[in-house]
């Protein structure tokens, strides 16, 4: 039986209760078979084009890098149906679930974007849907909670632990342990136990594939760097995957520095964590001095995650990708700058990547560079959060 690699260097693996191993084995085999099935690929591509709206645009910014020699393009995943990159891989996994004969879907969500994407895919494909969401995130993201419920999903608030994404992940896995015969766990990021990191990357890699074709058509060359925010890491690995072999292209992932790395209120385990076992995988993890999982923090719910996908850990370890961090305040500035200068309201998550690109442009204004930011989602879900933050700062 063909098998996928369970590890990226030392990272990854499958650290789950024995009861889930058959479900993960079944998923791996179904994915391998589906990837070799032309009819499955055609159905997936048809959904991406006719339902989700691919290909998404590659937009050259007009004003935000004025006074520099940087050309900054945005890969517009914010224009995808559902409002973020999440829709890509959710459609793939939902098709896979149907192929396996599962008729219920379990999901976890932080910002609510994965929950919304899962709910829309389930509505489209006739699957039952239940979404676990940290109670704090239910408060932070009420528009997305209502969207999920409108599309027929059951949203289950999780009050344990920090009542955020990591706790929702734990509850979703617990549910799946008891229901895997009829339910598929539709994991929302390129992390977790094998084979999820590989499956999610493959269903997201269309981001980088399109970007490569579009930038070559527009500029006649590859970009100097592609930049993406990193929480669990699915939008970033989707952007990076097709560029990993292109050694001239820098891969830059941006973790949330939150209120500052020195404050411990951040979500940057790649650069500031220790390797541990969490969420079914071996990966960098925010831990306290006793080795317990430390609470992560970010203004953006979708980056508020104490670990990171194993392929990012590997790309960091071998030096192929660079990982930097951006604070809440810097992300907030970039959020406003894009709205004011380009008429585009980005997700707070994506604003972290944008902030770093703007920094790169103005750090060397005379340097001719071609940058692409993965604008992973739109900011409608964040306008109330941003309004309150600006009000509190007296900046309105």
From Swiss-Prot:
Pathway: Amino-acid biosynthesis; L-tryptophan biosynthesis; L-tryptophan from chorismate: step 5/5. The keyword Amino-acid biosynthesis applies. Transmembrane segments: none annotated. One of its GO terms (molecular function) is tryptophan synthase activity. The modification N6-(pyridoxal phosphate)lysine is found at residue 86. It catalyses: (1S,2R)-1-C-(indol-3-yl)glycerol 3-phosphate + L-serine = D-glyceraldehyde 3-phosphate + L-tryptophan + H2O. The keyword Lyase applies. Keywords: Amino-acid biosynthesis, Aromatic amino acid biosynthesis, Lyase, Pyridoxal phosphate, Tryptophan biosynthesis. GO terms for cellular component: cytoplasm. GO terms for biological process: L-tryptophan biosynthetic process. Its EC number is 4.2.1.20. Its cofactor is pyridoxal 5'-phosphate. The beta subunit is responsible for the synthesis of L-tryptophan from indole and L-serine. HAMAP family: Trp_synth_beta. Tetramer of two alpha and two beta chains. Belongs to the TrpB family. This is Tryptophan synthase beta chain. It comes from Vibrio cholerae serotype O1 (strain ATCC 39315 / El Tor Inaba N16961). The gene is trpB.
């Amino acid at each position: 039986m063909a098998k996928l690699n369970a590890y990226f260097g030392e990272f990854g693996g499958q650290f789950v209760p024995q009861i889930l191993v058959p479900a993960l084995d079944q998923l791996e085999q179904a994915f391998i078979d589906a990837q070799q099935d032309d009819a499955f690929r055609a159905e997936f591509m048809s959904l991406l084009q006719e339902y989700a709206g691919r290909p998404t645009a590659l937009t050259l910014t007009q004003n935000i890098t004025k006074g520099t020699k940087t050309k900054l393009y945005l890969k517009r995943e914010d224009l995808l149906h559902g409002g973020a990159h999440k829709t890509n891989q959710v459609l793939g996994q939902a098709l896979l679930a149907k192929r396996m004969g599962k008729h219920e879907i379990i999901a976890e969500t932080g910002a609510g974007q994965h929950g919304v994407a899962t709910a829309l895919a389930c509505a489209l494909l006739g699957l039952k849907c239940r979404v676990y969401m940290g109670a704090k995130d239910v408060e932070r993201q009420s528009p997305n909670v209502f969207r999920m419920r409108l599309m027929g999903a059951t949203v289950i608030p999780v009050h344990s632990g920090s009542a955020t994404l990591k706790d929702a992940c734990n509850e979703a896995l617990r549910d799946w342990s008891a229901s895997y015969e009829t339910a598929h766990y539709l994991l929302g990021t390129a992390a977790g136990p094998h084979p999820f990191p590989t499956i999610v990357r493959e269903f997201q890699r269309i981001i980088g594939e399109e970007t490569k074709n579009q930038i070559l058509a527009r500029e006649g060359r590859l970009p100097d760097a592609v930049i993406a925010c990193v929480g669990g890491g699915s939008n970033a690995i989707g952007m990076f995957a097709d560029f990993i072999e292109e050694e001239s292209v820098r891969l830059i992932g941006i973790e949330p520095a939150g209120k500052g790395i020195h404050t411990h209120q951040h979500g940057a385990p790649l650069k500031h964590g220790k390797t541990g076992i969490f969420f079914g995988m071996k990966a960098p993890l925010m831990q306290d001095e006793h080795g317990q999982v430390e609470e992560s923090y970010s203004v953006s719910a979708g980056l508020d995650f104490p670990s990171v996908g194993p392929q990012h850990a590997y790309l960091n370890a071998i030096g192929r990708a660079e990982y930097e961090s951006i604070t809440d305040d810097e992300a907030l500035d970039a959020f406003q700058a894009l709205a004011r200068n380009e008429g585009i309201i980005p997700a707070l998550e994506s604003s972290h990547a944008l902030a770093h690109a703007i920094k790169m442009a103005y750090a060397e204004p005379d340097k001719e560079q071609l940058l692409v930011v993965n604008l992973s989602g739109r900011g409608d879900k964040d306008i109330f959060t941003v309004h309150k933050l600006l009000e509190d700062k007296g900046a309105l």
